[in-house]
Amino acid sequence: MKKTLLCHFYNEEYMLPWFLNHHKQIFDHGVMIDYHSTDRSVEIIKSICPTWTIITSRNPDFQADTIDTEVNDIESQIDGWKICLNVTEQLIGDYSILNDEPKQLLVPSIFMVDCDRERNVTQDRPLYEQKFDGFMFSDNQQNFLERRSRSLHNVPVHYPANSTHECMAPGRHWNTYNTDQLVTLYYGWCPMDDGGFARKLQIQTQIPLIDRQLNRGFHHITNKETLTYRLENEFIPRSRNLLKEIEFYVNTHKNLSNIL
């Protein structure tokens, strides 16, 4: 059954090489929704994944509910397995469970944290071969809720406009998970070098007034000092070395990544 990745992005030239080089091994096709990028993002996509579709968003900015509505509309035209991820998320694990049985998989996250900022990263190697610290969804409920599940499905799924018992909205984050054979490696706080700080700081320019008034996307309204404080006081103290856990998913990925 065909597998399609959706992703909305704005000026993500720093993270895109890792995101694209990983997912092109897994998905038959990708639909990249461009929120009017002014950097090399589109050029990078065309270079690494030349057969993928690039759509210019109908939305002028990152208004959370209209993002989800646009994703809903695009997904409704796609058959087979589909998932919408941010550029900071990488799906990895046992892809053999993506069979023809109709189902919705709620995929949890491993929250990666840059505890060793002195170790430089390179874009010609996967991030999972360079950074190994963070915290696991399975360790406790707080860790799971820090980055809730994504929906990977081959049945119709509607992203709600407001939060429900099942889903935190807007944003498409689900409040439970039903598999640990697949996970997303979440790199929103790793690496936190100059490129990592720059991408987090530029997102706030795309948060509209209506979302600010509704207290949506408030975590994007920030500065470098606040980001550094959160990294050092909120995330690093909770982190541990996850090399063993990451190797499990990476080895499974390497064994199965050609199963499309």
Predicted regions, residues:
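Active-site-proximal specificity loops/subdomain of glycosyltransferases
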Residues: 4, 18, 40, 44-85
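Receiver (REC) domain switch/active-site residues of two-component response regulators
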Residues: 28, 50, 88
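Active-site acidic Asp-centered loop
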Residues: 35, 85-87
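Catalytic-site signature of metal-activated, phosphate-bearing donor transferases
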Residues: 64-73, 91-260
